[in-house]
A protein has these predicted regions:
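C-terminal membrane-cytosol helix-exit motif in multi-pass small-molecule transporters
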Residues: 153-154, 168-188, 369-378
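A late C-terminal transmembrane helix in Major Facilitator Superfamily
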Residues: 323-351
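Paired small-residue
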Residues: 98-106, 291-299
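Helix-to-loop junctions at the C-terminal end of transmembrane segments
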Residues: 60-72, 157, 252-264, 351
Length: 409
């Protein structure tokens, strides 16, 4: 048995838990927009309801660690999973915009609490030699599982009302794997305050990339399904589009990482932003054909999921040894969450006038980020850190899991 196998086997139950959790999460996050659109809810209301999920996620990144520290990982996991399952099931019982906003808030808070628990366990059971490989496996599992969740949307119409129930069952299955896990509970350090203006002054390109990257990904999961329902009125189109785009995001991580190590983050951020702009313009003019939409979706996935990891890598490149890398990394994640929160609010309001405004906004942000990136100073090759693949969604503990943190201690 190889060393990496010896490292993975003890935490295989965590990977199974992550897989089922991500399938349920990905399915419900996309389906909420579809379901609300089928109920003929206004786009502005859909945007506000979806933004509530990310508001819960942001607050969870601040508050959940103290909860976990007090009651323990396994009890906290059961509690957060129970809250998440309850919120899913309540979605299917009754629609009220205020109730749904609160339920989405609870879902976001509990989901990110679950991620913090799982990632802290992974961090506890991995050493510095295998940390990068385990993080890569985590990334692959998260992308693929979230993609599988999109396929489950494309079930027989007779069972569409059961989507929330299916999502609940998947989350409950993850509890089984955690309950059978024999892993020492890591000690969680208390949440430390950070200043976004301070971080922006230190790593402006990284902060801007994190904000815009969060906007792209948040808009993708919450409002692109609404856009597709407006244009095609087909759950099947939404399902396949989301699947193909996520696969594009997964396949892009390693090539873009290698290219950024060779040519620098600044240039790759600009290229990804430019590509996002061009693909967004393609949607404006050639979105009448589903095959073309799927192709554009794959191309969009190649770029939007890489911007935040590139921003984090840029921060690691430019930071001095006396800077608090952990503080900066957590602030970038917080900034990413703010971008995800803003996206459904802005897009929901904009597409109330015309659905094409979604990709007009994407194109404008892509142009801005491209020029902003190229205006910044290039980092010498000798100062480049190693690019690390980061899942589209992660908790605050994944920052501790980043093997680049080891290099600064």
């Amino acid at each position: 048995m190889s060393k990496i196998q010896q490292s993975i086997l003890p935490i295989s139950s965590l990977f199974f838990a992550i897989s089922f959790l991500a399938i349920g999460y990905g399915m419900i996050l996309t389906y909420v927009g579809i379901y609300l659109k089928e109920l003929d809810v206004s786009n502005i209301t859909i945007g506000i309801i979806n933004a509530s999920f990310f508001l819960g996620a942001i607050l969870s990144s601040i508050l959940s660690q103290s909860i976990i520290s007090k009651v323990g990982h396994i009890r906290s996991f059961a509690a957060f999973a129970s809250i998440m399952v309850s919120s899913f099931l309540l979605h299917s019982i009754y629609y009220d915009q205020y109730l749904w906003g609160f339920l989405r808030f609870l879902s976001g808070f509990s989901f990110y609490g679950l991620l913090i628990i799982l990632e802290s366990w992974l961090n506890e059971k991995s050493d510095s030699a295998d940390r990068g490989k385990i993080l890569a496996i985590y990334t692959i599992i998260f992308y693929l599982s979230t993609a599988i969740g999109q396929l489950l949307l494309n079930i027989n119409e007779k069972f569409t009302q059961s989507i929330f129930t299916i999502g609940s069952i998947l989350v409950l299955i993850s509890i089984i794997f955690i309950s059978l896990t024999k892993i020492k509970e890591p000690i969680l350090e208390p949440f430390e305050k950070f200043s976004i203006p301070k971080i922006y002054s230190v790593v402006p390109l990284a902060a801007t990339s994190s904000l815009i990257g969060g906007f792209f990904v948040g808009g993708f999961f919450t409002m692109i399904p609404v856009y597709l329902m407006i244009e095609f009125n087909s759950v099947e189109v939404v399902s396949y589009f989301m699947l193909i785009t996520l696969l594009g995001g997964l396949l892009s991580q390693w090539p873009i990482g290698l290219l950024s190590d060779k040519y620098g983050r600044r240039r790759l951020i600009a290229y990804c932003a430019q590509s996002t702009t061009f693909v967004s313009l393609f949607f404006l003019f050639f979105s009448f054909n589903t095959t073309m939409v799927y192709i554009f979706g794959f191309l969009l996935g190649l770029t939007i999921f890489s911007i935040y990891p590139l921003g984090v890598a840029r921060a690691n490149d430019v930071m001095d040894e006396n800077k608090d890398i952990l503080e900066i990394s957590r602030t970038l994640l917080f900034t990413y969450g703010i971008g995800s929160f803003i996206a459904p609010l802005v897009i929901g309001f904009s597409i109330s006038f015309n659905s094409n405004f979604l990709f007009i906004i994407f194109a404008i942000l892509g142009i801005y980020l491209s020029f902003y990136s190229l205006s910044k100073k290039r980092i010498d090759d000798d100062d480049l850190s190693t690019f690390i693949n980061i899942p589209v969604t992660s908790g605050t503990k994944l920052i501790d899991f980043d093997p680049r943190q080891e290099e600064t201690t």
